[in-house]
């Protein structure tokens, strides 16, 4: 198995299709033969619910219980509590109890590294680990960025969400300087886009003009469609729910771009080591 790549999907702005993107990227990677673990790091538990586990509050083992054991220096089985979805991905589930972890982390030693410590042994079992971050820049998101090799930023195709990019980029920069110097930005993904509208086209132009010289703007654009929400409600990926639709095709294209991005980074790294 090749080296596992950990990707955080982050944006402090809600409503950017971040969870939908995590789910469909993960299952898209599984369709390409990759072993994938999804980490639901949002106390809302939307990723857990979207994969069909509507009883998250009654699950005995979640991300919160495992992180708590690390904080309290208690022994734990690293792969305990992981659930398997019929479309080929595994998930570390979450429920609202994770919200208390923000407070617990504030005064903890090595507080930014707790999630990284948890994922360390899991990495040997997977090609990709995708972390669905909460829509804030609190300690859980900092933990995700500290644990990740790279970050993908989903952005809604409206003007105002672009304004939040500045703060997110500052946070990523701080994490790179102080916690994770190897953290890379894989790119920005435009989501919920109706490219028939002037607003969406203007947003894309603005995104490419302001950030495109320094950051990859993925060629794939995820269109707005009711089928994306319906698939989550059905506990399925968009490929299973509407495999011939525009959203499924867009996510398949995005998945290919992510794989190509990873291969380029790996080849570049191996080339630098051989010099």
For each of these PLM feature ranges, what is it?
Residues 1-275:
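P-loop NTP-binding core
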């Amino acid at each position: 198995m090749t080296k596992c790549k950990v990707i955080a999907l982050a944006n402090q702005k809600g409503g950017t299709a971040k969870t939908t993107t995590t789910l469909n990227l993960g299952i898209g990677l599984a369709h390409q033969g990759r072993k994938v673990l999804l980490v639901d790091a949002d106390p809302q538990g939307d990723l857990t619910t979207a994969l069909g586990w509507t009883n998250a509050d009654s699950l005995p083992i979640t991300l919160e219980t495992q992180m708590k054991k690390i904080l309290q220096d208690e022994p734990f089985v690293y792969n305990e509590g992981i659930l398997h979805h019929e479309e080929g991905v595994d998930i570390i589930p979450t429920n609202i109890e994770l919200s208390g972890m923000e407070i617990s982390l504030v005064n903890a030693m090595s507080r930014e590294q707790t999630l990284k410590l948890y994922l360390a042994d899991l990495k040997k079992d997977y090609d990709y680990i995708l972390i669905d971050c909460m829509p804030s820049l609190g300690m859980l998101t900092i933990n995700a960025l500290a644990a990740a090799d790279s970050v993908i930023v989903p952005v809604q195709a409206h003007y105002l969400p672009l304004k939040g990019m500045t703060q997110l980029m500052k946070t990523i920069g701080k994490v790179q300087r102080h916690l994770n110097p190897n953290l890379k930005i894989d790119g920005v993904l435009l989501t919920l886009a109706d490219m028939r509208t002037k607003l969406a086209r203007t947003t894309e132009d603005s995104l490419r003009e302001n950030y495109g010289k320094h950051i990859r703007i993925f060629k794939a654009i995820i269109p707005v469609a009711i089928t994306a929400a319906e698939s989550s409600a059905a506990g399925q990926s968009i490929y299973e729910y509407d495999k011939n639709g525009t959203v499924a095709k867009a996510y398949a294209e995005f998945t290919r771009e992510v794989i190509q991005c990873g291969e380029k980074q790996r080849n570049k790294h191996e080339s630098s080591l051989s010099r």
